[in-house]
Amino acid sequence: MNFKYIVAVSFLIASAYARSVQNDEQSLSQRDVLEEEESLREIRGIGGKILSGLKTALKGAAKELASTYLHRKRIAEDHEVMKRLEAVMRDLDSLDHPEEASERETRGFNQEEIANLFTKKEKRILGPVLGLVGNALGGLIKKIG
């Protein structure tokens, strides 16, 4: 009879040990998932800060260009440039509200058309820069969204 109790107690101990090992494995996998979620949140936070910095820089550049055109006499060409700059400013402001931006598709700007409004020197500088910035922002928005 003592042998039956020893076997029963041994079986209970073995099953309790197996359950504790299984619980440990589950808690480790849950901890891994939580660590991955935390690192993703950190990456999103860094991406958000970079995007915010780029947005601020672009807003500043657009405001500077707008103020430059305000101080000169407005001709039809300048008026078009101002309209485009205002559209860019609205698009940059929409980055503050991603839920609204995701509802509507972001507009693509015809880089050649914008670049033709500037002189050749400005064209050589701004054309590639606007293209790179547009591609970078598009890539970041896709990754974040």
Curated annotation (Swiss-Prot):
Q: List every position bearing Isoleucine amide.
A: I144
Q: Report residue numbers covered by any propeptide.
A: 19-43, 74-124
* The keyword Manganese belongs to this UniProt entry's keyword annotation: no
- What's in the GO CC field? extracellular region
**Keyword Signal annotated:** yes
Tissue distribution: Expressed by the skin glands.
GO biological process: what's one of them? defense response to fungus
Which residue windows are coiled coil?
none
Q: Which UniProt keywords apply?
A: Amidation, Amphibian defense peptide, Antibiotic, Antimicrobial, Cleavage on pair of basic residues, Cytolysis, Fungicide, Hemolysis, Secreted, Signal
Q: Which protein, by its recorded name, is this?
A: Maximins 3/H3 type 1
Which species is listed as the source? Answer: Bombina maxima
> What lineage does UniProt assign to this protein's organism?
Eukaryota, Metazoa, Chordata, Craniata, Vertebrata
